[in-house]
Every structure is written in structure tokens, then in C-alpha cells.
Amino acid sequence: MSKPIIFLLTAFVVLTDLGATEDTEKVEVKAKPSKTSRGAIGQGFELHKIDLLSKELQGTGAQVFEELPVEECTTDNKLGTIQKDDTFYSNTESLYNSVASNSKIEPSLKGPFTLGTSVGAVTNNIVSEKSEIQGLSLNLKAYSMIHALKQDCINKKPLAKDLVSDFEALDREVKKPWLKPSWRKYKVFLEKFGTHIVRETMSGSSIYQYVFAKSSESFKQRDFKIKACLSLGGPTQVGKLGISACSDVSKKDVEESSGKEMVKKLVVRGGKSDTRVDLTGELSKNQINKFLKEATTDPSPIQYTFYPVWTILKARYIGKEHYAKATNLEQFYKGYLNFDCAYEKSEKGLELQKFELAEDSDPDAPTYVCKLGPEGCHSDDDCESDDLIYCACCGDSCIRYNNTVLLSTGDTKKVAFINDVDDEFRDHGCGRKGLKCKCKEENKKWGQSWSGDSDADAALRDINAMMLDQNRRDQAKRHHVKKGKSLH
């Protein structure tokens, strides 16, 4: 049996608008690592359906491994640190960056599909791709321990029997991949076992006070800080919370803040459940400090990092016939779901967007692209006279591209639409034929807005091809020897 290939996750740093870090206090952690402090480590969850910011993941995730012996497969390190700081989110992208960075989710997944549930939970769903938001969080954190799943166990420990049987039963070739029903089995697999496992848990106790508003309100960073401090402690306790960010809030600040409407969200995690119940409304310094100190004796998870299920499967099945299914799973999630390459047609039945195999896709390690219908005219009816010289593409089958800026990522997404309004979209296949404008040079070349190919994927495909070729030769040799023995 070939040795499993070990995949290393590349650490990435995403910049957020951090406020001044306050005093860090060292404390002695008396608690010992436990099932409670480790939480849902090693379990599978659908990342796009869970709230990573305001809810604690219950230990009821999917079973991905047959077993993960604690002593053999986890590392437990005590931290013993209380830290108080604040984070300013200057725009929508910085908020998404923060969530992705803290959860160690790859940058390509930091958009609204994968992280929208989490971001919506603390912003009261005022986030959209059409309007920017700004905000701030007061972060009061007591870190007790960090628990991590060892990479060797991720790569070698037996996978759950039903996961293996369900995975190997998936279609190797997905026919008509642009149609959502074609991916039904893959969708069911992700729903059952999750898109990611919990790789690490940070235990302790934490209090986060979030405040947000649409950027159009033109609030300053200090406005958000004052509102967060008032939301946490109220007008009478705001300067007595033991938080330096709130120490200079004046009576005038309190009065002016009352007229500034913002979305507020208090998130309390970790510590004792009985104490958490009491931490509602306006808090006092004693309440805050008591709860943070509970991290030393009664820690529970306050932060999680994740690892993709398809990365686990690619490591297990590289060089085998089922490897194609692992890449299918990854590309379905990243391209069809997360990038939103759903099948789109115009009212006249013209294909605008289509999820399809790349032209040079390897059947043993498929890669997909998000294709856009050929830009320009597709009928003489699309072409009309712009003036005495030029023709313009404007009609029911005139396809035009537009680059849309995604506020959640800062990236641009190329989209195709029917241009039946702008009669100054000159040329694009339209030209003069006598006195009339005709579709003289119809474009047949499809555009592309997303590709599942990367340098890392190319390297893995090469390794998979070499190992698969060797395995097939070995299998043919064994078959030949067996056949020879049967003849004698």
C-alpha cells in the first residue's frame, strides 16, 4: 500500500484594523484538559451553515474518523492569558478577513456563502454585497488551553466506515455538471459528514461586544468605540469597566452617542454556563473579571480552526481510482457553491453561466471552470445603428460582461448579462452590411470567471498520475502472474 501523502496547510495572515492592545495578564490555569475543553475537535461540520462567532459548537458534529484516541492524537497546551483589546472593521471585507483568519479558513472561502451565517449573526444581517458596513468589537478574552489534532492522525487514522462507503459510492464522472441535480450525491455527502473538521479548539472564556452600522452613516472609529463601551457597561459603568478603550468616555460622549443608531450584539462564550446566563444587558467590572477568571478552572471552547474534508480524502486516495471523487467534492464546493456558478440562462434560452470541466481536465483528477456565454451579438436582431458609421450590440441575445466588486472579499467577479438597454455597446460582432447593421462576426469563444486549477493542484495531479500509473502497472502484473498460474 502506498504511503499517505501529508498535506501541509500554509499559514496566512490577513490584516484587520486592530485597535490598541491592552494589558495582558498572566494567570495560572488549574483546569486539566477534558472532553469539555476540547469540544468538537475532530468532528465534521458544514461550515456555511454554522455560526462561528456567537454560538458554541456542540459536540454533535459528524463522525469523520472511526476513532481518535485522545492521548495519541491531540496536543494540549496551557496558555493562561487574559487579554483585552478592540478591533475596528473599516469595511465589510475586513470583517470577513477577521473571521477567515481566526478560523484558519483559506482565503478563497472567505465570502458570503461560507462565512455569511457567521457574519450575519453579529451584524443582524445588515451585511450585503450592495452596501458597505463598518464596526468595532471590544474583545475580552481569557485563554486557558489550546487543543490540536495531530496531522499524523488526520492522515492515518481509519476513517468512519460509513464515510468510506458513501464516498466510494459517489459518481467518478459527473455528467452535466452545470445542473445542480447532477451533484445530488455529493451534496448529500457534505450534508452528512460536513465540509470541514474542527482541527483546533481554544478554550477559556470570552466576552465580545460588537457594534455595526452601514458605512453610509459616516461614523468615525471613535463613535463605534464609544457605542461599544456604552453597550457593554451602560452610561454609569462605562468608565469603570477596567478597559482602557472605555476609560476616556465622557458625559458629552454619552449624550452624543444616544442619537447614533447602530446594531449591537453581545457574545459570551466559555466559562461556566450558569455565569453565562447572568451576563446579559449592562455588565460591571466585577462580573467581567469573575467570568474571565473562570477560564482557569472551567474552560470551554471559545474559538475554533478548521480543516477541509476533501483535503483528508485527497491524502487518503491519492494514486487510487477514487481520487477523482475527492477533487470533484472540492471543486463542487469551491466553484459551484462558494463561487456561485449556478447554471444561468436568459429568457430566450441563451446560456449565460455554466459550471463545466476544463478543456484540459484530467479524468483522474478533474478540474472545473465557471464559463460565461460568448460575449457579443448572436443574432442580426442584436445589432442596431449607433450612428452613420458604427453599429452597437443591443438585443435579446447580446451578451455583455461586467466586473462586479465583491464587498466581502475586495475581489471582482466577472458576470454575463443580456445587454438590451445600452445602445452604445459598439461592435462586438456587429458591423455594417450595406446600410444595415448585422451580426457579421459572431463570437463563439466562451469566457471564464473562475478556475479550479492552481499550481498546488497541478503538482498533486502529477503525483496522482505517477502513483496511479504505477498502481495500474502493478495490478496488471499481478493479474498476468495469476493468469499464468491458472494455465498451469
From Swiss-Prot:
Please tell me whether the keyword Translocase is annotated for this protein: no
Tree of life domain: Eukaryota
Query: What would be an example GO MF term here?
Result: toxin activity
Q: Which UniProt keywords apply?
A: Cytolysis, Disulfide bond, Hemolysis, Nematocyst, Secreted, Signal, Toxin
Q: List the disulfide bonds.
A: C370-C383, C377-C391, C393-C398
Keyword check for Disulfide bond, yes or no.
yes
Sequence ranges assigned to domain EGF-like in this UniProt record: 369-398
Signal sequence region: 1-21
Q: What is its main location?
A: secreted
Any GO BP: killing of cells of another organism
Show where the MACPF domain sits: 24-344
Which locations, inside or outside the cell, does it occupy? Secreted; Nematocyst
The UniProt entry, under PROSITE patterns, shows: MACPF_2
Q: Gene Ontology cellular component?
A: extracellular region; nematocyst
| PANTHER family in the record | COMPLEMENT COMPONENT C6, FLOCCULATION PROTEIN FLO11
What is this protein's function per UniProt?
Causes lethal toxicity to the shrimp Palaemon paucidence, and hemolytic activity toward sheep red blood cells.
Protein's UniProt name: DELTA-alicitoxin-Pse2b
Species name for this entry? Answer: Phyllodiscus semoni
